[in-house]
Amino acid sequence: MGNKIKAVFFDLDGTLVNTLESLKKTMNDTMEHYSLEGVSLEETKKFVGTGSKKFVERTLEKNAQVWYDKAEKWEEKDEEKAMDLDLKGDEVMEQLEEAYDYYRSIFPKNCTYKVEAYPGIISCLDNLKEKGIFRVCITNKPKEEAVIILQKLFAPDSFNMVLGDNAKVPLKPNPDMLLYACKELGISSEEAIMVGDTKTDLDAAKNAGMISIGCLYGFRDKKELEVHGAKHLVKDGDELWQILKEYYL
């Protein structure tokens, strides 16, 4: 039996909502704008989780690496050519700020593209509401984009609070957003549980001194969730509710 909780904090992408297609589309539209190679769904899974800017950076790194690999092959044959190829890779990375701004500018029109709530999540939220448990969405995505997605898929009173990237508060795995939510709700970190699908979420929970639950249906594998300290692993929203009800309510 765990401590009785008063709040459940949820990550967004890969936890509440499957947003892979929208993330992939926005990135590929961005890369097309710069005549660069886009990402697959698997790459999207791997690259997201630590904020939109990091997603853009990792995609640019993938493109730059093509030039760096070519440069390495030419190092012994033609040093000057190798340096030129290296510079092309550097030029790709120099576009980070501009590419990130472009990504942000087009994301609002794509953010609900093929998005859907994961099985059992809506009923889990309803059950928590019925029990008087606070429901908070804490995401590294910009808050305004998160709100658009949540408004499309969930009832208006599904969440007591939504926190996201505002360029002021450090992102997960820093615990500041989690601790801020606790303060605003008037609870201790031991009275909240973090539910997420990546090490970013689980590390944030650990740094805030709270228990975490890992979502096997999200963007990362079981091993990552286990290594980063998930107390429980769940396959869908129904199992999440059962765990919460049995151990923490």
Locate the predicted segments by residue.
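Asp-based, Mg2+/Mn2+-dependent phosphohydrolase catalytic module
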Residues: 1-8, 42, 66, 129, ...
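Residues at secondary-structure transition points
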Residues: 14, 18, 39, 43, ...
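Hydrophobic alpha-helical packing elements
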Residues: 19, 23, 55, 95, ...
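An amphipathic alpha-helix signature
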Residues: 24, 28, 45, 49-57, ...
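Substrate-recognition element of Asp-dependent hydrolases with the DxDx(T/V) motif
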Residues: 27, 121-150
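Solvent-exposed, charged/polar functional surfaces in cytosolic regulatory/catalytic domains
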Residues: 29, 33, 54, 58, ...
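Metal-dependent phosphoesterase signature
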Residues: 58-123, 131
